[in-house]
Design a protein with these regions (language model features):
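Active-site beta-to-alpha loop of glycosyltransferases that engages the nucleotide-sugar donor
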Residues: 1-15, 32
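Acidic helix N-cap motif at the loop->helix transition within catalytic regions
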Residues: 8-12, 35-44
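Residue-level signature of catalytic and energy-coupling elements of molecular machines
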Residues: 10, 17, 70, 88, ...
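Short beta-strand/loop segment that forms part of the nucleotide-sugar
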Residues: 14, 23-33, 55-56, 85
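Short helix-capping segments at alpha-helix termini
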Residues: 19-22, 45-51, 78, 105
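A conserved acidic beta->alpha catalytic loop
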Residues: 30-39, 89
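Acceptor/aglycone-binding surface of glycosyltransferases and processive sugar-polymer synthases
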Residues: 57-76, 81, 93-176
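Catalytic donor-sugar/metal-binding loop of nucleotide-sugar-dependent glycosyltransferases
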Residues: 147, 170-174, 183-195
């Protein structure tokens, strides 16, 4: 979970994830939040022990680089399933179970929490952001023929093998286009994606 000034949400999102039926570990990648986000996480580490980790970075370096740092950390720790999600509850933590089951039980390599399929929805977003995101996904599908309706989705479960195959050091985008590039590279490498 990448963070920058998420003091309002961070404890709630951590507690919610840890309340789920499945056992999850959480890595917070904090980009030097001046609001005390990292301090809240460190305090919660006393309660959650070896399930909660923090990677503190100096200054705001971009969403994509935060995810890449988290992915590299997760690969070294040998996690089989690696998730990405936001801290602001724009992704429903209850759906982590659905993403996990899709990869673990259904043989999918990349499970995408899509906002633009029949059962998907958008939470806590203004209308203009929805239009921009949907338009970007439509444009990407037209250009690449990638069979993903929500190319900019940031709620994803990857098998570790996908992240090991993609050369994370060659990812070019550090902003929201990072989401598109990751899905495209997974698809081009022959991995199975499901929304």
């Amino acid at each position: 979970i990448p963070t920058f000034n998420e003091i309002e949400n961070i404890e709630k999102i951590i507690r919610k994830v840890f309340s789920l039926q499945e056992v999850f570990h959480i890595l917070i990648v904090d980009d030097g939040s001046p609001d005390g986000t990292a301090e809240v996480v460190k305090h919660l580490q006393q309660e959650f022990g070896t399930q909660l980790f923090i990677l503190e970075r100096k200054g705001k370096q971009g969403l994509g680089t935060a995810y890449i740092a988290g992915f590299k950390w997760s690969i070294t720790k040998k996690y089989d399933y690696i998730f990405e999600m936001d801290a602001d509850f724009s992704h429903n933590p209850d759906d982590l179970i659905r993403l996990y089951k899709s990869v673990h039980e259904d043989g999918i390599d990349v499970s995408i929490g899509s906002r633009y399929i029949k059962s998907g929805k958008v939470e806590n977003w203004p209308l203009n952001r929805i239009f921009i995101s949907y338009g970007a996904s439509l444009y990407v599908r037209m250009i690449t023929w990638m069979p993903v309706k929500d190319c900019t989705a940031g709620f994803v479960c990857y098998r570790r093998s996908v992240l090991e195959k993609i050369n994370l050091d060659k990812i070019r985008f550090i902003g929201y286009a990072f989401q598109i590039e990751m899905k495209f590279r997974a698809w081009r490498n022959g991995f199975k994606l499901k929304e």
